[in-house]
Each structure stands twice: as C-alpha cells, then as structure tokens.
C-alpha cells in the first residue's frame, strides 16, 4: 500500500512539475496581493512607490515533500520613465526543484499631464533558471537511475505591455518566448515551446466611497497544449485610520483543456496595508474529479513600499499606494 501511495505521489508531482515549473515562475494568485509584478513584467516601477515583496507558499499540508514556492521581488521607477525590477524564486516539488533569477527593464510613457494616470508601458524580463532532479533517495531499482542530483541551467525571457487610464488597467504578457533545448527530462514529454500568454483587464472604482471595488479577469493560454484558463476576481478595499483592509476572491476556470484534467481553483485572500507595510494570507482550494489531497494551498505575503512619491490624481492601488 505504501509503494502504491509513493508511486501516485511521484506521478502526481512529476505531472504537476512538467506541466508548470518548467515554465520558470509558476503562476498563482499572487498578483491579487499587491504583487502584479510577479506575473506581469510591465508592472515594474509602474506606481508611485517602490515595492519589496516576499511570499511563501505550501501545498498539501501534512504531505512529505509537497510542492512549495518562495519568492523575493522588488521593483521601482528610476527617473520619469524607466522601471527596474528583479525576482528570486525557489520552487520545489518532491524530487524536482528549480531556482531562478529574473531581471526586468520597463519603460513607461505618460500620455497626459504628469499628475494624471494615462500611461502606456513596455517591459522585457530576462531570466536564468536552474532545474534539478534529486535521484539520490530513489528506492525503486532501475538501471537508468544514477542516484545523484542531476541539474541543468537555461535562459528565457518574458515580454509585457500595460495600459492604465484612471481606474482602468490592462496587461499583456508573453512568457518564455525563447525556445530551449534541455536534456534533463525525456524529450518525448519535454517541449521546446514553453510559451504562455496572459491578459489582465480590470477597473477600480468607488475612490470617494466607504468601500472601493476592483473587479478583474486574467486569461491565460498555453501555446503548445492549447490549454486556456481564466481567473474571475473581485477585490474590496476599506480604509480604517492608518490602515487599509482588503479582501479578494478568485475563481480559476479551465476551458478547452485539450485532453487534460478539468481542474478549477477557488481562492479567498485577506490582507492589510498599514502605512508602508503589507501582509496577506491566501488559501486556495482545488476542485475537480481527481484530487491528490484535500488540504488546500496556503500562502503568506509580506511587503514594504519604499521611496514613495506623491500619488497621482486618480488610479488603481497598483498605481497609487494607500499611504
């Protein structure tokens, strides 16, 4: 029975890893925790504050070697038009892991007066990633297993665009635009094409009201498999003294999955911005016909806004920090 559970765990982890972690940084719901830059490079330096963010995510609580992800990111505007940013991440899933560094250059074009929000942005991210497979603890005899830690490094790039007009915001990102030949995994299952396309649309309103609302949708498409996903999101803000309380709810739905499993995710998020600091908690529940574990996914995000400038006349919280 234990061997059957081990095999199921390895196969589940392997399919999850090949399906996502080879595509550099995995895409979850971090962007709803005031961390849009993790998903869209055009958000680098886009607002009136520099932003430092740390996230820690764990899956399948109580399961040994379950997937986990940690990120450290920062970005800020330099001068009037240039944004710079970086991301460090560590992604582990059972015997598989990857560590990466991403650096971003963004250019922001103001289409109206400097104190208004009417801005077009372009960005390019370059990244270096090291993938590894730890075979040293494998207990299943197989002549093709070397029982060492095998690793391989490669490079990739993301391109992004964004447009903001007062409370309206939109992003487009093409991820992993370079084709990479790698020998770490079986070429029958590992494609050169890791491209993924993302579009985010949203609107922030109620700035003068007791509550502010931010509905948004993020759509994803994977070029190689034809998979399509959409996140339907609602975020609510409320200012209390020197703090801003907020909560978000996200529903990720898969469409036309080209023969893959129909997996959907429900994600509630709660957070608070106090002066220049931010903390949030994210819980994700997976739904579908086949589930490895019912424990869900947990994430903590911490943030610090630095070198803040005067806010512009109107804009979403990603443009104008709370304090």
Feature-to-residue mapping (PLM):
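Sec/Tat signal peptide C-region and signal peptidase I cleavage site
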Residues: 17-21
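Bacterial N-terminal signal peptides
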Residues: 8-16
């Amino acid at each position: 029975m234990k061997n059957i559970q081990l095999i199921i765990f390895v196969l589940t982890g392997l399919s999850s890893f090949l399906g996502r972690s080879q595509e550099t940084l995995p895409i979850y719901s971090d962007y709803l925790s005031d961390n849009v830059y993790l998903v869209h490079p055009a958000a680098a330096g886009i607002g009136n504050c520099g932003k430092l963010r740390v996230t820690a995510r764990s899956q399948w609580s109580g399961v040994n070697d379950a997937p986990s992800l940690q990120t450290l990111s920062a970005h800020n505007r330099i001068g009037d038009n240039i944004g710079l940013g970086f991301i460090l991440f560590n992604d582990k899933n059972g015997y598989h892991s990857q560590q990466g560094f991403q650096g971003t250059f963004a250019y922001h074009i103001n289409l109206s007066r400097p104190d208004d929000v009417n801005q077009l942005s372009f960005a390019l991210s370059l990244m270096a990633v090291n993938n590894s497979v730890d075979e040293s603890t494998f207990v299943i005899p197989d002549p093709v297993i070397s029982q060492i830690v095998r690793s391989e490094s490669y490079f990739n790039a993301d391109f992004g665009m964004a447009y903001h007009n007062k409370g309206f915001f939109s992003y487009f990102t093409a991820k992993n635009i370079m084709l990479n030949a790698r020998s770490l995994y079986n070429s029958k299952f590992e494609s050169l094409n890791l491209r993924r396309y993302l579009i985010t649309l949203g609107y922030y309103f109620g700035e003068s009201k007791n509550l502010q609302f931010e509905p948004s949708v993020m759509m994803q498409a994977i070029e190689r498999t034809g998979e399509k996903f959409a996140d339907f999101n609602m975020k609510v803000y409320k200012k209390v003294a020197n703090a801003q309380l907020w909560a978000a709810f996200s529903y990720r739905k898969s469409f036309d999955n080209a023969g893959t499993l129909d997996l959907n995710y429900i994600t509630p998020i709660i957070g608070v911005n106090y002066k220049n600091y931010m903390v949030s908690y994210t819980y994700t529940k997976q739904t579908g016909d086949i589930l490895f574990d019912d424990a869900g996914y947990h994430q903590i995000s911490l943030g610090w806004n630095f070198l803040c400038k005067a806010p512009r006349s109107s804009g979403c919280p990603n443009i104008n920090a709370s304090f």
